[in-house]
């Protein structure tokens, strides 16, 4: 950064440096999204005793590129009676928060674009904005199917955001910070010797399960994909979209999946910390490799759920969120609060 500031001046150098860091995060993220689609098709293919994509390139590795080229070449058709400006704005409102949230995601304790103290609050605020893109997409298309899908999706996202928020309260109580780097550091000590036994997923196990399943519902993934239930409402709020406008919604969904996987890994699974004690030498050393492995395991759960569970009815989804997840999180928050101030506390106050 000092080199750029010496050439371009203080303000221009800082701006260029920030843009370079944004590009360094966004471009690999888009690549991960593309190949997550291939991984999904391969994993589900093997679970259904078939091969999956294997024609474009070796082992089908060029399939995401072929899909991107196909969508780029397709025309974006605007429905006759739609609100044209809002119709085109909706995909941007969906993908924007999904990418902007990565500004505060730490890959290691030193590798983070913006290490702000309220990073978790920033992510919660941004992810809640994604629902506006969904509602606008459903309304602007002037289709009863897209509007019904948008209403379902909005209600589902808002309902499960509450459960996710309450699950995060437990993490905030034991870590004492909204900073994601501090939350990971809090998991590096304890009676588990800094290993997998020190991470939050053990004492906060009910909150961990609620957060993971709520993340699946928040991203409208199976078995919570009633917003685009093909057998009921064609494709939900996607129904009027084509070409790159449809592809951007697709990118937003998978970018949100990766974001939920990263947050689950950071909040409950120790982030970049090794599952082995630090005394084990190189095996006990933390790093981005461990964060990537944990994210891959969480993403595999997303794909596994899609391949194995049937779709819930809409009323079942609402009942699960309001009558099961929210009471469970509230009860466990009380348990953790009492545990922290008891003689058996495993946390430093």
Curated annotation (Swiss-Prot):
GO terms for MF: NADH dehydrogenase activity; oxidoreductase activity, acting on NAD(P)H, quinone or similar compound as acceptor; quinone binding
Subcellular location(s) per record: Cell inner membrane
Residue ranges of the TM segments: 14-34, 85-105, 120-140, 164-184, 196-216, 243-263, 285-305, 324-344
Biological process according to GO: aerobic respiration
EC nos: 7.1.1.-
Primary site of residence: membrane
Top class in the EC scheme: translocase
PROSITE patterns according to UniProt: COMPLEX1_ND1_1, COMPLEX1_ND1_2
Keyword match Cytoplasm: no
Stated role: NDH-1 shuttles electrons from NADH, via FMN and iron-sulfur (Fe-S) centers, to quinones in the respiratory chain. The immediate electron acceptor for the enzyme in this species is believed to be ubiquinone. Couples the redox reaction to proton translocation (for every two electrons transferred, four hydrogen ions are translocated across the cytoplasmic membrane), and thus conserves the redox energy in a proton gradient. This subunit may bind ubiquinone.
Family from the record: Belongs to the complex I subunit 1 family.
Protein name: NADH-quinone oxidoreductase subunit H
Gene that encodes it: nuoH
């Amino acid at each position: 950064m000092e080199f750029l500031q010496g050439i371009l001046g203080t303000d221009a150098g800082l701006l260029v440096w920030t843009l370079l860091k944004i590009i360094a995060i966004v471009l690999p993220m888009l690549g991960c999204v593309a190949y997550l689609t291939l991984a999904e098709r391969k994993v589900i293919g093997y679970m259904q005793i078939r091969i999956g994509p294997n024609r474009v390139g070796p082992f089908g590795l060029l399939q995401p590129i072929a899909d991107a080229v196909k969508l780029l070449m397709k025309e974006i058709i605007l429905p006759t009676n739609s609100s044209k400006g809002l119709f085109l704005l909706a995909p941007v409102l969906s993908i924007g928060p999904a990418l902007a949230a990565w500004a505060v995601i730490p890959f290691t304790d030193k590798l983070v674009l913006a290490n702000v103290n309220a990073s978790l609050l920033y992510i919660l605020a941004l992810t809640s904005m994604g629902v506006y893109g969904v509602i606008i997409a459903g309304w602007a298309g002037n289709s009863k199917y897209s509007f019904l899908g948008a209403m379902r999706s909005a209600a589902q996202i808002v309902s499960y955001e509450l459960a996710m928020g309450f699950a995060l309260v437990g993490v905030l109580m034991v870590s004492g910070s909204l900073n994601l780097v501090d939350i990971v550091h809090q998991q590096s000590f304890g009676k588990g010797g800094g290993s997998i036994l020190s991470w939050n997923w053990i004492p906060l196990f009910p909150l961990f399960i609620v957060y993971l399943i709520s993340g699946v519902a928040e991203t409208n993934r199976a078995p919570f994909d009633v917003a685009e239930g093909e057998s009921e409402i064609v494709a939900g709020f996607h129904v009027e979209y084509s070409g790159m406008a449809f592809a951007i919604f697709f990118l937003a969904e998978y970018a949100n999946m990766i974001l939920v996987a990263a947050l689950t890994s950071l909040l409950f699974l120790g982030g970049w910390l090794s599952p082995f004690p630090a005394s084990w030498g190189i095996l006990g050393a933390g790093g981005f490799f461990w964060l990537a492995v944990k994210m891959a395991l969480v993403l595999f759960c997303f794909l596994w759920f899609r391949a194995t569970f049937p779709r819930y009815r809409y009323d079942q989804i609402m009942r699960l969120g309001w009558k099961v997840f929210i009471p469970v999180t509230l009860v466990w928050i009380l348990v953790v609060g009492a545990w922290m101030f008891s003689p058996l506390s495993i946390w430093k106050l």
